[in-house]
């Protein structure tokens, strides 16, 4: 195929194979985490080796709430920065697509369940030290019809 036709075919395939989790007008949660220039590796390690492990293992006493939490975990995506921002910070993007109303999106209960009160405070302290003064920005969005 000539390059123009090949590009057109690949573009069409890409648009028709996109698999969105949320439906049109369904809520999504997008969180931007702003990380200090020298804390990217530390944040990445805490995030994937401690925070997300605790979140994945968390078990709620209420089976209905646990079902919501399980659905939320399946809808959760983390985008790691490919490079440093122009201001020498790093930005991680967390997406809940869809946002599951009633599910647990706070990390402290899962940290406390896995590591105990003191351990959770210690992990949370190290986690918090990684953020810039801007910390995190959270946005609720809705999928637009395309």
Task: Map each language-model feature to its residues.
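Short, glycine- and small/hydrophobic-rich beta-strand elements in well-ordered beta-sheets
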Residues: 15-26, 55-93
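Extracytoplasmic/secreted envelope proteins and their assembly/folding machinery
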Residues: 28, 40, 44-48, 108, ...
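Bacterial Sec-dependent N-terminal signal peptides
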Residues: 1-20
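Alpha-helical interaction segments
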Residues: 5-6, 32-35, 117
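Acidic/histidine-rich, surface-exposed loop or edge segments in extracytoplasmic proteins
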Residues: 24-37
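Surface-exposed, polar/charged faces of alpha-helical domains
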Residues: 38-41, 53, 60, 84, ...
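Sec-exported extracytoplasmic/periplasmic mature domains
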Residues: 36, 45-56
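Intrinsically disordered, low-complexity terminal tails and linkers in eukaryotic proteins, enriched
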Residues: 21, 79-146
């Amino acid at each position: 195929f000539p390059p123009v036709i090949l590009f057109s075919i690949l573009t069409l395939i890409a648009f028709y194979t996109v698999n969105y989790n949320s439906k049109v007008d369904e809520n999504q949660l997008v969180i931007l985490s702003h990380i200090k220039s020298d804390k990217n590796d530390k944040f990445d390690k805490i995030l994937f080796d401690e925070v997300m492990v605790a979140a994945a293992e968390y078990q709620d006493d209420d089976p209905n709430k646990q079902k919501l939490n399980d659905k939320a975990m399946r809808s959760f995506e983390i985008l790691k920065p490919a490079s440093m921002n122009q201001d020498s910070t790093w930005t991680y993007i967390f997406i809940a697509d869809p946002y599951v109303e009633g599910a647990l999106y706070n990390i402290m209960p899962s940290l406390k369940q896995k590591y105990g009160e003191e351990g959770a405070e210690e992990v949370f302290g190290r986690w918090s030290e990684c953020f810039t003064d801007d910390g995190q920005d959270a946005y609720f969005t809705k999928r637009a019809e395309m």
